[in-house]
Amino acid sequence: MMGHRPVLVLSQNTKRESGRKVQSGNINAAKTIADIIRTCLGPKSMMKMLLDPMGGIVMTNDGNAILREIQVQHPAAKSMIEISRTQDEEVGDGTTSVIILAGEMLSVAEHFLEQQMHPTVVISAYRKALDDMISTLKKISIPVDTSNRDTMLNIINSSITTKVISRWSSLACNIALDAVKTVQFEENGRKEIDIKKYARVEKIPGGIIEDSCVLRGVMINKDVTHPRMRRYIKNPRIVLLDSSLEYKKGESQTDIEITREEDFTRILQMEEEYIQQLCEDIIQLKPDVVITEKGISDLAQHYLMRANITAIRRVRKTDNNRIARACGARIVSRPEELREEDVGTGAGLLEIKKIGDEYFTFITECKDPKACTILLRGASKEILSEVERNLQDAMQVCRNVLLDPQLVPGGGASEMAVAHALTEKSKAMTGVEQWPYRAVAQALEVIPRTLIQNCGASTIRLLTSLRAKHTQENCETWGVNGETGTLVDMKELGIWEPLAVKLQTYKTAVETAVLLLRIDDIVSGHKKKGDDQSRQGGAPDAGQE
């Protein structure tokens, strides 16, 4: 075979990379992503300004929001971005630390791969380390009393201090706590807190941030359909529909042949009678407000107005669900089936206000709302979007604590405690595995190290003294004060994080590192046919889909 042409198995326009080259490529991609985000950790974090393709601006220091906007080529970088999204959906906080940790885990593994250690050895050490990390975290966690308002505000505050909104921290903490407490829903001993669905954030530019508040009820961006309808109703009876109050046209196309002209008037009359019947079904229940997801014809408006009923049309389905939860109404699909128990009487006030140039309907002062609207005011759209992102994080933290009331110390303290525990355990280990195992402990120190770097203090001196501190008894709550860059006891500073967030961060970071270490071959697929003719033989870059 030596003299013959090499046998081509893969087609000519695919490119294959394998072995060490791929592994170091993946590790570098992950490190690059981690470096982008590194300065966004802690209370002294920097903001990033991103321009999207449409020319809009995003200004944020939320790890997930930054990575969402970045377009990357390398497949390993894509999976890094994916984990920050998972973290955001799962626990809503810790998106920055999960990326930094995963990047660091891969970075310490590179050294072993260079020494020809097999990736599987590194992986099994990482897995073992993860189990020990989880058990150590659970050991240092403390239970929390969720009914104590000050404690809860303190926890939310430690999540908010790293964000833009920290200037208004007490306002933001109260908003987040009230909103989450409102949408908390218990049945048969099962807690359900659905923030996405029932706690809506409405942003209205104008005013100042101090004007923001949580409404005990719902606000929608709609006006009444007829100018003479009432705009201020106390204790309204509310009917919610998801059908239209218009003449129903048949599903299939129908043709009517008219021979006499009286028939024509009869047809119009039938349409009118149909609408009148619909309205009468509603009017029987004597509601004050009718809200529907579909349209309301002029004639129906006329009948409703004569009965002194306010009508609001084309409301979003999600808003309608929220109104139903807030005032206790049921959404009805057919007006003729309306019954007394479908009417919502839980709201204390319906009023329509003009804010800026637009009209908003407020349904507030609900007796026992299970949905709420957070009204945000602020100078510009960019600020509002950032404040909204921060509030979402704060609400998620609050939700995590309510669902799983366990806390671990923040400020890099839990990382150092876990790292110390791992180092102690590795002393008893024999064989090659102890080195990658010890490296995990080293990787965990990236969190306190980054906190120290971001506030401009001396990294080496502080980290060494922090390590020394953690070797002493009962010092596992010592960490870095991100504001000043000094070492403090987190118990005194009152910076705590939910255990759920930390567990998820560690699991995700280690799993991702393991996943990327497993890859030893990248085959990039075909290029488009058009490209092929123009650049014959030029293989696409690794990672181009």
Swiss-Prot record:
The modification N6-acetyllysine is found at residue 222. GO terms for cellular component: cell body; chaperonin-containing T-complex; microtubule; zona pellucida receptor complex. Keywords: Acetylation, ATP-binding, Chaperone, Cytoplasm, Disulfide bond, Hydrolase, Isopeptide bond, Magnesium, Metal-binding, Nucleotide-binding, Phosphoprotein, Ubl conjugation. It comes from Bos taurus (Bovine). It is found in: Cytoplasm. The modification N-acetylmethionine is found at residue 1. ATP binds at residues 42, 94-96, 411, 482, 497. Coiled coil: none annotated. Mg(2+) binds at residue 93. One of its GO terms (biological process) is chaperone mediated protein folding independent of cofactor. Disulfide bonds join 366-372. Belongs to the TCP-1 chaperonin family. There is a cross-link at residues 15, 248-249, 381 (Glycyl lysine isopeptide (Lys-Gly) (interchain with G-Cter in SUMO2)). The keyword Methyltransferase does not apply. It comes from the Eukaryota. This is T-complex protein 1 subunit gamma.
